[in-house]
């Protein structure tokens, strides 16, 4: 690895990892569950980097030995040829490990570990846009289930012909934001709607916002800025239906954000949910403002994450989902059943390559 600064950084990571390992064996840490969990989590976040660095060092030594054997004129020609072939394989392996190490050393998005609120809003296209928003809810729900994540519908406003005018999902699990953050933006569908008698293709849109969950410490909300009213919840069965005002209609006066929450069983639970959604929305606004203010720095080549950015078109006639940031097509039938892993992995890879290019240019 030619870059000396990367070697120094890797040695520093290795040193920190060994120090954290030592602390896990410290009786004072072991008897403090909170501290033990924090240390264990910090150590786990470095483990892949340290293991890859160890593999790189071992491979580098193996390569040096193979190259020496290939150069040794006293050895058997057949043995020299085998050594040369091994050296070529080890060189390829070493290049792969170096690329992986560079990716592992990239700055991490502090939100990547967080759960999310995923908001889907029907855009242009009337009833068909609401139906499309409902399709997106199913796509993300199925993808989340395939990842063993937990999904819950927090808030909804149904469309007249089905689907949703607006829906908010809570998705919890391992590194949810790190993947689904790439889904923020405008999703356009081109198809013949079920409501279209003449068979004409319509274009409709829905907007996806991906909001990391935040607690009340990260986002403070002045109670005076909240205007709240209650309403009776509709629903199936139960003595409380249409008798007790459990639904909460919450307005944040400074921003005009309005949240209507009916999914929980009690008014208190719905209020807590509404505040949780509000914090996530305010935090997302902060993130958007921060990104908009960074004009001289690189913007992600897989998109800005802005709600107005058109990121993908779903064409039913051609059975094709086109990601405009990647300039690639993907099979629509897979996407519609929640199989979007390849798209997300490609987004992540392109984002990492862009960051690596910036890193190389800055050195």
Curated annotation (Swiss-Prot):
Peptide chain release factor 1 directs the termination of translation in response to the peptide chain termination codons UAG and UAA. It holds the Pfam family PCRF. This is Peptide chain release factor 1. HAMAP family: Rel_fac_1 (MF_00093). It comes from Acaryochloris marina (strain MBIC 11017). One of its GO terms (cellular component) is cytoplasm. The keyword Cytoplasm applies. It is found in: Cytoplasm. GO terms for molecular function: translation release factor activity, codon specific. Belongs to the prokaryotic/mitochondrial release factor family. It comes from the Bacteria. Methylated by PrmC. Methylation increases the termination efficiency of RF1.
């Amino acid at each position: 690895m030619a870059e000396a600064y990367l070697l120094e950084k890797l040695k520093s990571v290795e040193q920190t990892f060994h120090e954290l390992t030592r602390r896990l064996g410290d009786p004072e840490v072991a008897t403090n569950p909170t501290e033990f969990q924090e240390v264990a989590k910090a150590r786990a976040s470095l483990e892949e980097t340290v293991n890859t660095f160890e593999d790189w060092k071992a491979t580098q030594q193996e390569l040096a030995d193979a190259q020496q054997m290939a150069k040794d004129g006293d050895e058997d020609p057949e043995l020299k040829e085998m050594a040369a072939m091994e050296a070529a394989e080890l060189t390829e392996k070493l290049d792969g490990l170096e690329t992986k190490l560079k990716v592992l050393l990239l700055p991490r998005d502090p939100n990547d570990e967080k759960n999310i609120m995923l908001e889907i809003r029907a855009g242009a296209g009337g009833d068909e846009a609401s139906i499309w928003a409902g399709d997106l809810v199913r796509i993300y729900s199925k993808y989340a289930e395939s990842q063993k994540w937990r999904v819950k519908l927090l808030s909804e406003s149904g469309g007249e012909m089905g689907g949703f005018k607006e829906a908010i999902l809570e998705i919890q699990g391992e590194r949810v934001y790190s993947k689904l953050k790439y889904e923020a933006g405008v999703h356009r569908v081109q198809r013949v709607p079920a409501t279209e008698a003449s068979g004409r293709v319509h274009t409709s849109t829905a907007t996806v916002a991906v909001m990391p969950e935040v607690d009340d410490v990260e986002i403070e909300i002045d109670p005076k800025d909240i205007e709240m009213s209650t309403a009776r919840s509709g629903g199936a069965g139960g003595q409380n239906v249409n008798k007790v005002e459990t639904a909460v209609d919450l307005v944040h006066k400074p921003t005009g954000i309005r949240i209507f929450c009916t999914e929980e069983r009690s008014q208190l639970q719905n209020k807590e949910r509404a505040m949780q959604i509000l914090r996530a929305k305010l935090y997302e606004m902060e993130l958007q403002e921060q990104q908009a203010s960074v004009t001289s720095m690189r913007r992600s080549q897989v998109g800005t994450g802005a709600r107005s950015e058109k990121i993908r078109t779903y064409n039913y006639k051609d059975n094709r989902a086109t990601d405009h940031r990647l300039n690639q097509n993907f099979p629509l039938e897979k996407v519609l059943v929640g199989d979007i892993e390849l798209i997300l992995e490609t987004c992540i890879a392109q984002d990492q390559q862009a960051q690596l290019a910036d890193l190389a240019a800055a050195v």
